[in-house]
Protein backbone atom coordinates (compact mmCIF):
# COMPACT_ATOMS: atom_id res chain seq x y z
CA UNK A 1 0.00 0.00 0.00
CA UNK A 2 1.36 3.38 -0.98
CA UNK A 3 0.81 5.90 1.80
CA UNK A 4 2.02 8.74 -0.41
CA UNK A 5 -0.60 7.89 -3.06
CA UNK A 6 -3.36 7.89 -0.44
CA UNK A 7 -2.13 11.19 0.94
CA UNK A 8 -2.17 12.68 -2.55
CA UNK A 9 -5.73 11.48 -3.09
CA UNK A 10 -6.84 12.98 0.21
CA UNK A 11 -5.15 16.26 -0.69
CA UNK A 12 -7.07 16.26 -3.96
CA UNK A 13 -10.29 15.61 -2.09
CA UNK A 14 -9.76 18.58 0.19
UniProtKB/Swiss-Prot annotation:
The keyword Transferase does not apply. One of its GO terms (biological process) is defense response to bacterium. Expressed by the venom gland. Keywords: Amidation, Antibiotic, Antimicrobial, G-protein coupled receptor impairing toxin, Immunity, Innate immunity, Membrane, Secreted, Target cell membrane, Target membrane, Toxin. The keyword Membrane applies. The modification Valine amide is found at residue 14. It comes from the Eukaryota. GO terms for cellular component: extracellular region; membrane; other organism cell membrane. It is found in: Secreted; Target cell membrane. GO terms for molecular function: toxin activity. Most of synthetic analogs show a decreased antimicrobial and hemolytic activity. Belongs to the MCD family. Mastoparan subfamily. Antimicrobial peptide. Has activity against both Gram-positive and Gram-negative bacteria (B.subtilis (MIC=11.8 uM), E.coli (MIC=7.5 uM)). Shows mast cell degranulation activity (EC(50)=15-26 uM). Has no hemolytic activity (IC(50)>100 uM). Its mast cell degranulation activity may be related to the activation of G-protein coupled receptors in mast cells as well as interaction with other proteins located in cell endosomal membranes in the mast cells. This is Mastoparan PDD-A.
Amino acid sequence: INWKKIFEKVKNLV
